[in-house]
């Protein structure tokens, strides 16, 4: 239909410039399918596509999952682990259920998006990456921003390209 064609045209432009994309819509509208479509339309089609569901990972573990950690950074960290941001280098990092990301983690993600750099947990070296960020949510992020449950600066940084998927009913 016309709405989907319009969304795909916007997605095509987003893919060509590697801008951050925010995909919103009800559960089951195909947000991850759209993220994969963006990947297939752009120069990152043969590069890594790393998906992480922010709601499925404990807040205490999310930072080390995204950014990795150095040996000895915490109990049980016996050797260095690459984070998903590093694994996705030159490709796309898909952050599903971004609205579930804890507030204390949001400024770290914001900096990583803006600077395309980050530090592993327990590390001192800045690592540079080239990652397109695609985030998705089925929740009302503007309302969450108003209620101070989601950072406004991260919200606006993520929605450089804003795709709202219509319900499939």
Predicted ranges, named:
Residues 140, 147-150, 164-169:
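Short, intrinsically disordered, charge-balanced linker/junction segments flanking boundaries
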Residues 72-79, 115-120, 143:
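Short gly/ser/thr-rich secondary-structure transition/capping motifs
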Residues 50, 80-94, 102-108, 119-138, ...:
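AAA+/SF3 P-loop NTPase mechanochemical coupling elements
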Residues 3, 9-76, 82, 86-102, ...:
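Conserved post-Walker A coupling segment in P-loop NTPases
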Residues 10, 41, 69, 108, ...:
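Conserved helical "switch/dimer-interface" subregion of ABC/ABC-like ATPase nucleotide-binding domains
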Residues 100, 141-143:
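Conserved H-loop
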């Amino acid at each position: 239909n016309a709405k989907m064609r319009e969304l795909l045209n916007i997605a095509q432009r987003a893919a060509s410039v590697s801008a951050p994309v925010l995909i919103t819509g009800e559960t089951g509208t195909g947000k991850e399918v759209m993220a994969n479509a963006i990947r297939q339309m752009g120069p990152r089609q043969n590069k890594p596509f790393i998906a992480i569901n922010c709601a499925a990972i404990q807040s205490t573990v999310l930072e080390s999952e995204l950014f990795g950690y150095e040996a000895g950074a915490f109990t049980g960290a016996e050797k260095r682990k690459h984070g998903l941001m590093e694994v996705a280098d030159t490709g796309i990092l898909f952050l599903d259920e971004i609205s579930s990301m804890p507030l204390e983690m949001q400024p770290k993600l914001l900096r990583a998006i803006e600077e395309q750099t980050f530090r592993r947990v327990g590390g001192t070296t800045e690592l540079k990456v080239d990652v397109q960020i695609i985030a998705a949510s089925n929740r009302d992020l503007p309302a969450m921003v108003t209620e101070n449950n989601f950072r406004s600066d991260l919200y606006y940084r993520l929605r450089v390209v804003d795709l709202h998927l219509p319900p499939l009913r």
